[in-house]
């Protein structure tokens, strides 16, 4: 079975594709903003209650009731007795508030892998372990926490990053499974109307806004049977076996993509999107004529690239120089028409016809420096331009520069 791509594991769109859903969201927006402000005030009281009351069944019940006012509804299967659940809870990662949701139905603590220790880390409900410099220090701190009498179970997310939960699970890290020979897996699904439950790469503040803005969000928790390590089973094998079990319960694939693959994909996507949709610069009729002059001299350069550079320079000579010296990259029109591989090339890959392509017979030509070749290319293009347009182009350049 072919494993899903990294892109399919992520939620990249906040808003729905259907026009009807977009219209409903637009009509709901005024009510949603009012609801957000009211819930923000109520949420402050929920935070105070969670700080004042000690961890108990009554506190969790009260917080669940108050959370329902915030539009957060939690349903779960029959809760297993504490002695059968174990000290390590393993869950898939859907949103930035998964640890808060699960703590409403079971006593547990979750360490943060990204939030720096301090007030914000404590206020978000994470377990503070001090400044952690490495994964080894984290594991030592967690082992010390587990050895303390009266300490609650640890809730860990081996995926380490959130996913859409629709197609697959990220590859489980092995370090959570080195803490104990028995773990308690549980699965989490999230449903929300009108918008996505969470968008990959967004901050937790943005997700909090949408949590309070949308009418309701339903979290469903399902407890799975405890899993014990087999004899001579390594941490990696143990982690993969639990991953397959949880993926089967969710009806998704257990992939080999890691959190680092997810981060790399999001980084590449952020850099590629602006490049794929460049903003067009409006040109005057004079600049349009100047672009045609450049096109006559450099026929391989597409007009879109010429327009873009002329919008910045306003000068024919400067634009020609930019293309000849490789300051502006473009896709030559000969490649586009021929259907060859669509990769960006610098003009020096194409506009080199005035000079011999093979091994020159003359020693002088063979020893031309790169700068001399550029100057030769520039002079050739300039000569072709002057032969075609003479002083007319110079006048239009001056008009364009004054405009």
From Swiss-Prot:
Q: Which residues lie on this side of the membrane: Cytoplasmic?
A: 1-21, 43-399
Intramembrane residues, please? Answer: 22-42
Localization, per the record, is: Endoplasmic reticulum membrane; Lipid droplet
| Domain (CUE) ranges | 286-328
| Protein's membrane topology | Peripheral membrane protein
| Superkingdom assignment | Eukaryota
Give the primary localization class: endoplasmic reticulum
Q: Which GO molecular-function terms appear in the entry?
A: ubiquitin binding
Does Endoplasmic reticulum show up as a keyword for this record? Answer: yes
Q: Which family does it belong to?
A: Belongs to the AUP1 family.
This protein is called Lipid droplet-regulating VLDL assembly factor AUP1
The source organism is Xenopus tropicalis
Its ancestry begins with:
Eukaryota, Metazoa, Chordata, Craniata, Vertebrata
């Amino acid at each position: 079975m072919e494993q899903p791509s990294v892109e399919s594991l992520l939620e990249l769109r906040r808003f729905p594709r259907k026009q009807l859903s977009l219209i409903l969201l637009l009509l709901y927006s005024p009510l949603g903003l009012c609801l957000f402000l009211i819930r923000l005030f109520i949420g402050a009281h929920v935070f105070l209650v969670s700080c004042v009351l000690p961890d108990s069944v009554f506190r969790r019940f009260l917080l669940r009731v108050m959370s329902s006012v915030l539009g957060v509804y939690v349903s779960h299967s029959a809760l297993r007795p504490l002695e059968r659940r174990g000290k390590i809870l393993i869950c898939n990662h859907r949103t930035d508030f998964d640890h808060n949701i699960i703590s409403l139905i079971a006593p547990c603590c979750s360490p943060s892998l990204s939030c720096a220790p301090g007030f914000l880390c404590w206020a978000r409900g994470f377990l503070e372990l001090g400044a952690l410099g490495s994964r080894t220090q984290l594991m030592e701190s967690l082992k010390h926490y587990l050895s303390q009498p009266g300490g609650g179970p640890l809730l860990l997310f081996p995926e380490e990053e959130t996913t859409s939960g629709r197609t697959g699970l990220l590859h489980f890290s092995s370090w959570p499974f080195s803490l104990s020979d028995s773990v308690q897996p549980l699965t989490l699904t999230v449903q929300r109307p009108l918008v996505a439950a969470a968008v990959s790469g967004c901050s937790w503040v943005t997700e909090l806004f949408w949590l309070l803005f949308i009418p309701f969000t339903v979290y469903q928790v399902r407890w799975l049977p405890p899993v014990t390590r087999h004899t001579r089973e390594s941490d990696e094998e143990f982690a993969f076996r639990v991953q397959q079990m949880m993926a089967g319960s969710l009806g998704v694939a257990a992939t080999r993509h890691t959190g680092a693959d997810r981060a790399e994909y999001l980084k590449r996507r952020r850099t590629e999107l602006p490049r794929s949709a460049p903003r067009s610069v409006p040109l005057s009729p004079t600049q349009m004529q100047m672009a045609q002059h450049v096109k006559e001299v450099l026929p391989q350069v597409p007009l879109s690239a010429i327009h873009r550079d002329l919008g910045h320079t306003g000068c024919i000579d400067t634009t020609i120089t930019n293309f000849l010296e490789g300051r502006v990259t473009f896709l030559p029109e000969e490649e586009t028409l021929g259907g060859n591989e669509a990769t960006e090339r610098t003009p020096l890959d194409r506009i080199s016809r005035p000079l011999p392509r093979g091994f020159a017979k003359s020693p002088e030509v063979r020893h031309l420096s790169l700068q001399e070749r550029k100057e030769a290319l520039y002079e050739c293009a300039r000569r072709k331009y002057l032969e075609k347009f003479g002083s007319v182009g110079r006048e239009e350049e001056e008009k364009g520069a004054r405009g």
